[in-house]
C-alpha cells in the first residue's frame, strides 16, 4: 500500500538580513518515514526544522502537514512533537510528572495518564523510574525520558534537533539503534537533524543533504554514499578519492576520463557530458585493492606507498603518484600483514562500477 505524504515543504525561503538561510527548499515526508536533514553548520537544516515546527516563520513558501496548510499556524496547533539536545526536562518534577505533563495539558483522566506513562516508560526500557527526578538519571536515561515525553501523546510527526549531540560516542551509538528500533516498532514519522554523517547513515530511511541553504541530494543512505550527485555529496559522506579529468570516451559499460598526468580511468556517470569536458571522478578507499602486482581490475594507479596507518580493524594506505598527488585505500587490518612496506612500488586497483563521475561543485 502506498504511504501517504505527511508533510510537504514547498519552496521555503528564509533570510536573515543579507544572509540567505534557505533558498527555495522543497521536501516531502511520507507516513512512517525517518528522514534526516544532514549538513554542516550553516547549511540550513535547523532553519528548515524550525520553520516546520512553527518556531521560525519563512519569508515565502508553504508548509503542509496532514493535508492542511500550516505555514504560519502557531507551533502548538501543528500536532508535532520535539526532542532537543538539552532534553528540556523540568528539573523540579518527577519523571512521571514530566511525561504526564503534555497529557495533563490535554485534560486526560488520571487513569488514562497513568496507563500511558507506564506504557511509554516500558517502551524506552525505563519502567521503574517514575518517582525519580531528572538529576538522578544519567544523560542517556534523561534523553530516553525526553523521547518518552514526546511519544506519549502520539504526535503526528516527531522533530528531533541533534538529540544525541551532547552524549559520548558509545552511548550515542547505543541510542541511535534504540531510536531506530522505536521508530520501526511504533511506526512513527520522524524528521531528524544532525551534522553527523554516521548517525544519518545508521538511522535514516532517507537523507536530505543540505549545503548553504540548498538541498544537494535526497535519497537513501546507500544512494547518497554510492551514487553522489555532486562533489560536495561525495566529499561530505564518508571518505573519498576525488580528482578532475577530461572525458575521452563514452560507452555503455562506462565513461573514461584522463587526468592531467595522463592516467586514464573509467567510471559510471549519470550526467549528460561531452567529450573533452572537465568532470570529477570519485572512488571510495574501501573499494580499492592494494597489491605489489597489477591485478585484473579495469582501473589501476601505480606509485610509491607513502604511509601506512592502522586504525583498529582498518588500515589506511597512502599512495603517492608520479605528479605527487595522493590516493587512499582502506583494507581490513591484517590482510596485507608483512607484505607491504612504506616505500614499496605498489598498485591500487578498482572496478569501473565502483567509481562515479560527476559534474558540478
Per-range role (PLM):
Residues 46-49, 145:
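ABC ATPase nucleotide-binding domain helices that frame the ATP-binding cleft
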Residues 59-62, 112, 212, 244:
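Conserved coupling/switch loops of ABC nucleotide-binding domains, chiefly the family-specific signature
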Residues 53:
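Helix-to-loop junction immediately C-terminal to a conserved catalytic motif
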Residues 240, 250-361:
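Non-catalytic connector elements of ABC transporters
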Residues 61-69:
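Conserved ABC transporter NBD signature motif
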Residues 38-40:
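The feature captures the beta-strand-to-loop junction immediately N-terminal to the Walker
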Residues 75-81, 85, 89-235:
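ABC ATPase nucleotide-binding domains
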Amino acid at each position: 500500500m502506498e504511504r501517504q505524504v505527511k508533510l510537504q515543504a514547498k519552496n521555503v525561503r528564509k533570510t536573515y538580513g543579507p544572509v540567505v538561510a534557505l533558498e527555495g527548499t522543497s521536501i516531502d515526508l511520507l507516513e512512517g518515514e525517518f528522514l534526516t536533514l544532514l549538513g554542516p553548520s550553516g547549511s540550513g537544516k535547523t532553519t528548515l526544522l524550525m520553520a516546520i515546527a512553527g518556531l521560525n516563520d519563512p519569508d515565502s513558501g508553504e508548509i503542509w502537514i496532514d493535508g492542511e496548510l500550516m505555514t504560519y499556524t502557531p507551533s502548538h496547533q501543528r500536532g508535532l512533537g520535539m526532542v532537543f539536545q538539552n532534553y528540556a526536562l523540568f528539573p523540579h518534577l518527577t519523571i512521571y510528572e514530566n511525561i504526564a505533563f503534555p497529557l495533563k495539558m490535554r485534560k486526560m483522566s488520571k487513569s488514562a495518564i497513568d496507563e500511558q506513562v507506564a506504557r511509554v516508560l516500558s517502551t524506552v526500557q525505563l519502567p521503574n523510574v517514575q518517582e525519580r527526578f531528572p538529576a538522578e538519571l544519567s544523560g542517556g536515561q534523561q534523553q530516553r525520558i525526553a523521547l518518552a515525553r514526546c511519544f506519549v501523546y502520539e504526535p503526528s510527526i516527531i522533530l528531533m534537533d541533534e538529540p544525541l549531540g551532547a552524549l559520548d560516542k558509545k552511548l550515542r551509538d547505543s541510542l541511535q539503534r534504540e531510536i531506530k528500533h522505536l521508530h520501526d516498532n511504533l511506526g512513527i514519522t520522524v524528521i531528524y537533524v544532525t551534522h553527523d554523517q554516521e548517525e544519518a547513515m545508521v538511522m535514516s530511511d532517507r537523507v536530505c543533504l543540505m549545503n548553504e541553504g540548498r538541498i544537494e541530494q535526497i535519497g537513501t543512505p546507500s544512494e547518497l554514499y554510492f551514487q553522489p550527485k555532486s562533489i560536495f555529496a561525495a566529499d561530505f559522506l564518508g571518505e573519498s578519492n576525488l580528482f578532475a579529468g577530461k572525458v575521452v570516451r563514452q560507452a555503455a559499460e562506462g565513461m573514461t576520463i584522463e587526468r592531467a598526468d595522463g592516467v586514464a580511468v573509467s567510471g559510471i556517470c549519470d550526467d549528460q557530458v561531452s567529450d573533452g569536458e572537465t568532470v570529477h571522478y570519485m572512488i571510495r578507499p574501501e573499494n580499492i585493492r592494494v597489491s605489489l602486482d597489477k591485478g585484473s581490475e579495469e582501473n589501476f594507479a601505480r606509485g610509491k606507498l607513502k604511509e601506512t596507518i592502522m586504525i583498529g580493524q582498518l588500515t589506511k594506505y597512502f599512495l603517492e603518484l608520479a605528479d605527487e598527488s595522493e590516493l587512499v585505500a582502506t583494507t581490513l587490518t591484517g590482510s596485507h600483514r608483512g607484505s607491504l612496506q612504506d616505500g614499496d612500488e605498489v598498485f591500487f586497483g578498482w572496478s569501473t562500477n565502483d567509481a562515479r563521475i560527476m559534474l558540478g561543485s
